[in-house]
Structure formats: C-alpha cells, structure tokens
Regions:
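Alpha/beta-hydrolase superfamily serine-hydrolase fold, recognizing
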Residues: 5-278
C-alpha cells in the first residue's frame, strides 16, 4: 500500500512510499520505495542511503531527502544499512554494494531497462554512496549514471575550517564518536572506501552532484572532494545553498517551502537531465 510522504502541498509532485524489501543472499533489507504520483517517462532509479553518523540514522530520518529525490523525478529505493559499532567498516559498505548489485539486476521491476541508475545519500549515507561509486568502478559493477551526495561525511580528521568554525558544541563529539565507531582503528582511515576525500585514484567515477550549504559544518570537505573529482576528470557539479540551512541536522526534518532542501530539488532535477541517456 502506498502512503503519502511529506505533505503534498510542499512539492511540485505528490510523492508516495511503500515498504520495499531487497533480498541479498540470506539477508533481507527492509527498505522503502518512493515514487512520484505521476512518474516521468524518463525516470531513473536512485539507491538512497539515509544519514546519520554511521552509528545512527533510520529510514524515517532519511524520508525528507528520499522524498526530495523522488520529487525531482526519480524512483527511489531507500535502504537501511548495518550500523556501527556492531558493524564496523566495511560491513555497511559491503551490504549496500550487494544490494546495489541486486537492484541493478532487477531494475526492470521498477523502471525501464535503459533507465539510469544512481546512488545517493546524506552524511554517513553520502560517504557510503561515494564509496559505492568507487566500488562499482573497481569491481566492474553496475554502471552508474551518477552519484548525489548531500553534505557527505568524507574526512575523519574533522579538521576543516567549516567544521572547526561551526558552533557545534557537543555535536562535534557526535561526529567524532561516529567515525570512531565506524573505523574501529585509526589505520582504517587510510582506506579510500572509508574516507573517499583522501582517495589517490578518483578518475573513472560516475558524474557527481554534491550539495552543501554555507553554514554546513561539512561544507569544506564537500567542496574539497568536488575539487578533487574535477581535477581527476570526473564530471562534477558542486552546489552551495545559502544559509541559514541548519544542515545537516535539518535533513531529518520535513522541508518547508523555500527551505534549502526544497531548493536543492532544482539542482537534482537538472542533474537528472544532464546525466540522462541520450
């Protein structure tokens, strides 16, 4: 049964969701399928990973971003993933990559066979989406039309100006604790799949849309990663929306008319158009 997502009046397209499980080996990931009431003929399929700090986050907290992706004109499968510290790196990444492969094989269940496939995520989910793009390249996996990263957690050092300058207070500890829970030991931070911003080889990745905000404490690592992708020859679009955005905390809230998440919908729609098969 389809349930309405956030109130229709706040969106150009009504968006609905239903439960959608993905069977991966012996495991079943209980996710959600988001779809516009009127699905565009050219709709792509987005595998979305919710936010949090690797040790937190749920499908419900990812609803606003998943809805925004669907409102931009895509079918979205939003997936949970194993949380740290019980499941340290690379367990969440391997689980989501297996799900990505399964979804790619079964893509015709939801969209046309030639429809583009994307990965997307916010915060820790943005980290996983960026790493999935690397894995798909390295393992000759599902061909991706693009990666959409909202304020991704990419740098475990937490030393950027935007992070240090943010009035984070105790929030700063939450990010450090999340990284510690995910990595387990410092040497794992050197792995490119764990901290994509430090990867030595970025060429050959799917086109990227990276969205951050002026007052986002993850702004600088988002911009740094976009710059490194561009230098490696990856077709990359970086969008810095105006503040106050209250990103990334606001990702878990219902977007309101004129909010930064609603304005990001236009950037996503443009990215879908630019990366659609010709």
């Amino acid at each position: 049964m389809l349930a309405p997502s956030v109130p229709e009046s706040r969106y150009r397209r009504a968006v609905f969701w239903r439960e959608q499980s993905v069977q991966v080996g012996r495991d079943k990931l209980a996710g959600r399928l988001y779809a516009p009431a009127a699905v565009p003929d050219e709709a792509g399929l987005v595998v979305h990973l919710h936010g949090g700090t690797f040790d937190s986050g749920t499908l419900a907290s990812g609803e606003a971003v998943a809805t925004t992706l669907a409102e931009a004109g895509a079918i979205v499968i939003s997936l949970p993933y194993p949380l740290a510290p019980a499941n340290p790196f690379p367990q969440a990444l391997e689980a989501t990559y297996a799900a990505l492969e399964k979804i790619a094989r079964d893509k015709a269940r939801w969209v046309g066979k030639s429809a583009p496939l994307y990965v997307a995520g916010e915060e820790a989910g943005g980290n996983l989406a960026a790493a999935l793009a690397m894995m798909a390249r390295d393992r000759h996996g599902p061909p991706l039309a693009g990666q959409i990263l909202f304020s991704p957690m990419l740098d475990a050092c937490l030393g950027t100006y935007s992070f240090r300058n943010a009035e984070a207070g105790p929030v700063g500890c939450r990010w450090a604790d999340g990284w510690h829970a995910y990595l387990g030991s410092p040497e794992k931070a050197a792995h490119p799949y764990a901290t994509p911003v430090n990867a030595a080889r970025l060429s050959g990745l799917a086109p990227a849309l990276i969205v951050t905000a002026e007052d986002d404490l993850l702004r600088d690592e988002s911009i740094n990663y976009a710059g490194r992708l561009k230098a490696a020859g990856v077709d990359t679009t970086i969008r810095v929306v105006g503040g106050p955005s209250r990103w990334p905390e606001a990702f878990a809230e219902i977007p309101r008319d004129g909010s930064c998440l609603c304005s990001a919908c236009d950037h996503i729609s443009a990215f879908f158009t630019a990366t659609a098969p010709s």
